[in-house]
Amino acid sequence: KDNNVIIALEAHAGTDFETPEKAVWIMEKTNHSNLRLDLDISHFYIEGSDVDHSVDLCAPYAAMVHIKDGKKVDGEVKYCLTGDGTINIEMFLLALSRNNLTHLPVFAEVSVQQSSKRDYDPRFTAEFCYNSLMEAINKI
């Protein structure tokens, strides 16, 4: 606490820490000013939680924000690049704004499921994610 270090926990699809309700529960039970949340909407979305509901619940505890995309296929989590799935990025950004989180940068996360592929191209990936986020920003 003396050094102002913040630890940001990230919920994760396919684990026991996969819903916004559980994330808030942990924040309330620990009740420590240096323990916050990394708001990664993809994990909540993949588990079936509504984007607005997830952001509304977790916003008071968010220290950082990132996004990737994905879905469950036969019970297995499959991640994809931001903008290459079905998460409504504009809705997510509007929910961040509505919850006064625009001061936090939104990081595009690349899952090891993509980065470990033989044909992974980091430049293409960075440009694709950037363009997806900018397209959403320009629409709102």
Q: What are the functions of these language-model segments?
A:
Residues 17-39, 45-140:
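Histidine-acidic metal/acid-base catalytic patches
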Residues 1:
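Aromatic-lined substrate-binding rim segments of carbohydrate-active enzymes
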